[in-house]
Amino acid sequence: MHIRSLTVKALAAVALGTTLIGAQAQVPEGKVGINYSRCDKNFEGWGLHTWKNPGIPLPGVEWQKPMPPTGTSDFGVYWHTDLAEYGSSQTVNYIIHKGDSKEQGGKDMKFSGKENKEIWVNSGDRKIYFTLEEAKKGREEKPCQ
């Protein structure tokens, strides 16, 4: 059964144009990834508002119409965006939200796409994690209620 499950995930990854590492999607070259986990596993309506400096949303992204997730993984959902969209600074600005409900304390968040190709965010936690292992440890320290 486990082999069948992995085969199905691998076929889904091929269809989506992504590569799975374990059960995580590898970020394609030239893109950055934001991974998001919720304790309730309910991602319906949650999206990504992302912009480049000085506050110019990426094409097609509006507050009322956030970017839907690119895909799912064992961690949760993820978004892949083109790093070039963020301009020469490659500063990735974002808010994960559902309507006016915002993650990470409702703050505008950012990270350097030059230094970090991928980040992980746990619901109810303000911290940005730079590895999956850090995110899992963060969840252990702040378990789901």
Where are these regions (language model features)?
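Structured interaction patches on ligand/partner-binding surfaces of diverse proteins
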Residues: 100-139
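Bacterial N-terminal signal peptides that target proteins for export
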Residues: 1-11
